[in-house]
Amino acid sequence: MMNRVAVLDVVGLTRGLIGEFTPRIAAFVEAGQVSSFKPAFPAVTCTAQSSYLTGLPEEQHGIVANGWYDREAAEVKFWKQSNHIVKGEKIWEKLRKVNPDFTCAKLFWWYNMYSSADWTITPRPAYPASGRKVFDVYSHPMEMKEEIKSELGDFPFTSFWGPKAGIGASQWIAGSAKWVERENQPTLSLVYLPHLDYCLQQYGPDLSDARVNVELGKIDALVGELLDFYAERDVEVMLLSEYGISAVDQPVHLNRLFREKGWITIKDELGLEMLDCGASKVFAVADHQVAHVYINDASLMEEVRELLENTSGVDEVRAPEGYSAERAGDMVVVSNPNAWFTYYYWLDDALAPDFARCVDIHRKVGYDPVELFLDPELKFPKLAIAKFLLKKKLGFRALLEVIPLDASLVKGSHGRDNVPVDEQPILVTQGSVKYDVISRPEEVADRIMQRVLGR
């Protein structure tokens, strides 16, 4: 007989944030067993989740960041969806071998397409030939998304990422988890709640900031709602997070440094600048506080290392040993605790590519947290958005250029693995069985399986 378990992945939750403004979470932690542990490296969503769900370190599951440079295609690829990208046996596959009746629902965790989990749902826009982007989700079974949308409405994509990101996306995901539980009663439910990821990057992890406290209260209320829901259905809940957010005030522009050295190749496209990775001698794929540096000209290896080691804001330059060789950079760079890496490569904002001022997570050669902000220099941002939406409704192609190019706006980041305990991810379990404190992200998989198996 297996226990039914729901794992709530509350992104950004740490010991340092639990307290006055999170009474439901605080009570759950007080009544259970909590482990703070060294995060995955890099401490980003795709790497952390892959370690949790395979029990393997990065060099074995292969997820070196949220995106990386594909050397064969000579393209940077971020936020891909196929579960086949993650190497290794997943925990639901292991548990199914123990008991063929075991089932798993994977709700908005990443790499959620073509997974062997029983029920999955993930954000997946449609891209018609007209060039439009139509917000939608993907599910397995395929018909499930329409059934869920008929009850919850369309997924609020703009609250999942961008300047309007907020609690709405996490509420919809929680609603989909309830729907799947009522309809299917999975043995294991994996539920992704990203809300804190937004405000903590916008404002920093500052508990003296009333805006942060308000957002903590929102996620606490939602977690409390799920705790009550699952308790009524005799489902054990585990609380989990992926990383903590560190306060930052120093953006570091590695690709601009490389460009000044003459190592970056720029392609002119309609008067704007595009980074040509395949033709560049050296370039960086930035992901929060970690960057993979790819060196196409091996003769520059030592010169690149010396430049990086003497760059303000850089804490470490690591060798790629221990990382997935075909995906990782030739060097892996870690920022100082107060710094983070941009993808910026242009030296004149007037020549920035057209997607730079848009929410465009796939074209940018790195992660861009500035997408969480509206450009403060826009006099009438709501009017710009209204014009865009009108054009979109009429079937015209248009760019929603409302994102600033000011990296100093970002106040929180993550990615480092050497962080204080109060900024480490946590795992909270309930029940009478007392476990050893976990110390590594790979151990999360065993702990989840132990709870399902009642061990």
Label each PLM-derived region with a short phrase.
Residues R4-A6, P186-L190, E236, D330:
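Residue-level preference for the first positions of well-ordered beta-strands
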Residues A6-V7, R24, G217-R259, W263-I264, ...:
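Metal-dependent active-site segment of extracytoplasmic phospho-/sulfohydrolases and closely related
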Residues G12-R15, P42-A43, E58, W109-Y114, ...:
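Short, solvent-exposed loop/turn segments at secondary-structure junctions
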Residues G16-Q60, T103-A105:
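Short, structured active-site-proximal loop/turn typified by the sulfatase FGly-forming signature C/S-X-P-X-R
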Residues L56-D206, S280-V285, Q289-N296, L300-E316, ...:
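His/Asp/Glu-rich, glycine-adjacent segments
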Residues T122-S150, R211-A221, R256-L275:
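Acidic, His- and aromatic-enriched active-site or binding-groove loops in soluble protein domains
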Residues Y243-Q289, F341-Q424:
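Histidine-centered active-site microenvironments of extracellular/periplasmic hydrolases
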Residues Y435-A445, M449-V452:
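C-terminal helical/tail subdomains of lipid-metabolizing enzymes
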